[in-house]
């Protein structure tokens, strides 16, 4: 199915691009989420009429993400978790735990934005973690996993 992108989507294209995607991806995700419209003549004309408005909105969203990236870059977030004497955790530190620690530090974050390429953290130590605030704004933070003291 051919669609018009209403915002930048990583791995797919930029605002205003006409791309071909699988029908289910368009019908079940992109169109209901307001990220795309079918590429019909009427929708293309409507998009061209609203292009400046949509570009301004996307620029505002990117500026907000870049501002949050500036606050977040280089920050160290500490997460306390029960651990054994050998430094292995009784459980793991997930992206939800890291997002909660970032929010506790006073910066807005969602667990879906926290990228853990090697899966959940399972040992005490310091880890480099990426927080994808936007496709063009990715902050790198340090997560310090410490043994919880009771």
Swiss-Prot record:
Keyword list (alphabetical) reads: Ribonucleoprotein, Ribosomal protein, RNA-binding, rRNA-binding
Keyword Aminoacyl-tRNA synthetase recorded: no
One Gene Ontology term from the biological process aspect of the record: translation
* InterPro entries, sorted: Ribosomal_bL9, Ribosomal_bL9/RNase_H1_N, Ribosomal_bL9_bac/chp, Ribosomal_bL9_C, Ribosomal_bL9_C_sf, Ribosomal_bL9_N, Ribosomal_bL9_N_sf
Cellular component GO terms held in the UniProt record: ribonucleoprotein complex; ribosome
- GO molecular function terms noted in the UniProt entry: rRNA binding; structural constituent of ribosome
Known role: Binds to the 23S rRNA.
Which family is annotated? Belongs to the bacterial ribosomal protein bL9 family.
Q: What is this protein called?
A: Large ribosomal subunit protein bL9
Native source organism of the sequence: Neisseria meningitidis serogroup C (strain 053442)
Q: Which gene encodes it?
A: rplI
